[in-house]
Swiss-Prot record:
Entries under InterPro entries matching the protein: Asp/Glu/hydantoin_racemase (IPR015942), Asp/Glu_race (IPR001920), Asp/Glu_racemase_AS_1 (IPR018187), Asp/Glu_racemase_AS_2 (IPR033134), Glu_race (IPR004391)
Top-level taxon of the source organism: Bacteria
GO molecular function: glutamate racemase activity
Function according to Swiss-Prot or TrEMBL: Provides the (R)-glutamate required for cell wall biosynthesis.
Species this chain originates from: Streptococcus gordonii (strain Challis / ATCC 35105 / BCRC 15272 / CH1 / DL1 / V288)
Leading EC class: isomerase
Matches recorded under Pfam families: Asp_Glu_race (PF01177)
Pathway: Cell wall biogenesis; peptidoglycan biosynthesis
Protein name per Swiss-Prot or TrEMBL: Glutamate racemase
Entry keyword set: Cell shape, Cell wall biogenesis/degradation, Isomerase, Peptidoglycan synthesis
BP GO terms, sorted: cell wall organization; peptidoglycan biosynthetic process; regulation of cell shape
Annotated PROSITE patterns: ASP_GLU_RACEMASE_1 (PS00923), ASP_GLU_RACEMASE_2 (PS00924)
Active site per the UniProt annotation: 73, 183
Length: 264
């Protein structure tokens, strides 16, 4: 047993989609979350800058004595997950491999779409992971640079958002039967994305898939939180407005949250 919290990091609010799934599947675990909304989105930034920013978030979480770190950001996972995993002596999870595996299990046609930030798409990491597991798959990737700013602005259902999503995803419509939401912000736009892609296209939430791996590692390392320890104190930190973060977090998680602004 290990009653320390699990640390989550993201470029902003997107990683809350992973936290929500964790709270559903593993409700007895405690969360510490840091979202770098002041510097979001990470996707258009150079790899070295993404690496530096991600390490800042990791080091912040380490000061909170977390027992595991979840890089709840596809861009950061693509750039620096391997390095962080090798250097830390606690488990470190990324969100890409779970999403890739789930897409392979889901598809019937072998035609998989991947949407993500420019960095995630340019890295080609989803195609590499999918084809390594199942070489016969046909992967089509599409960068969606406007999606993260819309989510960070809490523009989740506006007419502008619907128009942007429609125009962006049109090249993939009718060409895939499975679509990986290769950015943890994108599930916040899930209903609009589903409407554009059509009801027969299966959407894969890479972050939600990651929670299954969290559960496996908690059991493997025997670091589950004691179920007798009832007091949970989830803590959320943001580099931008605590008020704006709380509005999105409370809407998405369905509960009041404690949010503190920090400067890195």
């Amino acid at each position: 047993m290990d009653n320390r919290p699990i640390g989550f990091l993201d470029s902003g609010v997107g990683g809350l989609t992973v936290v929500r799934e964790l709270m559903r599947q593993l409700p007895h675990e405690e969360v510490i979350y840091i979202g770098d909304s002041a510097r979001a989105p990470y996707g258009p930034r150079p790899a070295e800058q993404i690496r530096d920013y991600t390490w800042q978030l990791v080091n912040f979480l380490l000061t909170k004595d977390v027992k595991m770190i979840v890089i709840a950001c596809n861009t950061a996972t693509a750039v620096v997950w391997e390095e962080i995993k090798e250097k830390l002596d606690i488990p470190v999870l990324g969100v890409i491999l779970p999403g890739a595996s789930a897409a392979i299990k889901s598809t019937h046609s072998g035609k998989i779409g991947v949407i993500g930030t420019p960095m995630t798409v340019t890295s080609d990491i989803y195609r590499k992971k999918i084809e390594a597991l199942s070489p016969e798959m046909e992967v089509s990737s599409l960068a969606c640079p406007k999606f993260v700013p819309l989510v960070e602005s809490n523009e989740l259902t506006s007419s502008v958002t619907k128009k942007v999503v429609y125009e962006t995803l049109l090249p993939l419509a009718g060409k895939v039967d499975t679509l990986v939401l290769g950015c943890t912000h994108y599930p916040l736009l899930r209903s609009i994305i589903q409407n554009v892609m059509g009801p027969d296209v299966k959407l894969i939430d890479s972050g939600a898939e990651c929670v299954r791996d969290i559960s496996v590692l908690l059991n493997y390392f025997e670091i589950n939180r004691s179920r007798e320890e009832q007091t949970l104190r989830h803590r959320f930190y943001t580099t931008a407005s605590a008020k704006s973060f709380a509005e999105i977090a409370e809407h998405w998680l369905g509960q009041k949250v404690s949010v503190e602004h920090i400067d890195l």
